[in-house]
Amino acid sequence: SQFLDPDGTFPNHIPNPDNKEAMESIKNQVLAVGADYGVIFDTDVDRAAVVTGDGELLNRNNLIAVLSVIAISEHPGTTIVTNSPTTEHLKRFITELGGHQYRYISGYRNVINKAIELNKAGTDCQLAIETSGHAAFKENYFLDDGAYVVAKILMLLPRLLERGETLDYLIKQLVQPKEVVEVRFKIETEDFKTYGNEVIKEFPQWIPQDWVVNPENEEGVRIDFKGEYGDGWLLLRMSLHEPLLVLQIENDLVG
């Protein structure tokens, strides 16, 4: 265990499974002591992430992939609701498992509410999860419960062992982007929402002709691209809580 002395100033790192420094800290400790796995929570344990014995980080898209394996194996054909900035590789991963991904607007409560709504409308949805680490299973009353998430992963391990597989093997089936970039543009005007939404509306007018607006998107504008600029996507959206435009880009080509 690390950092057992309570200190509300969090002097070691931000207690956040979506934070690079926090994940690097637990990864280094797992590798240093030769642990089988490492587990990290946020302060109120509604978010979690895992590090494998080989140092593979199971957060963000990787965590969604692992939990999707669990949900789809237990409920074939189920739908996984995620927030919008997830990779196209993840969508293909879920589809190849026999499941469906429903990308929705950011905010863990938005994702959970959409899953509840889909179930009421007759679409089986067993998992709602954000890249931030908030994950909620239908069987657990759609509570975002980090401890429950870790328990589900631990229960997956014997099934993997029977097949001669590990979490490391499992996550290697998910293609990883070569480059990931996030840029936050501050909107310095009083009516920032109107301004930001106008930028998003006009943005597709300025993209190259061979880039494509992805219709399966409910937040901001998502663009898919291939060719000389690589193979990837970008998402331009408003921040949930701040006067910011958030641009997220993933590419299978570095640079």
Regions found by a protein language model. Give the residues of each.
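Gly/Ser/Thr-rich active-site loops/lids in small-molecule metabolic enzymes
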Residues: 1-2, 56-75, 146-154
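Short, acidic/turn-prone active-site loops that include or flank metal/cofactor-
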Residues: 3-7, 62-65, 105-110
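Short, solvent-exposed loop/turn segments at secondary-structure boundaries
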Residues: 14, 54, 139-142
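Short, charged, surface-exposed secondary-structure boundary motifs
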Residues: 8-14, 69-71, 111-116
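Generic hydrophobic alpha-helical segments
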Residues: 22, 26-30, 68, 111-115
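N-terminal small/polar loop signature for handling phosphorylated ligands or for N-terminal nucleophile
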Residues: 1-51
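Short Gly/Thr/Asp-enriched flexible loops that form oxyanion-binding sites at enzyme active sites
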Residues: 46-66, 90-91
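Phosphate-binding and adjacent anionic-ligand microenvironments
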Residues: 37, 75-255
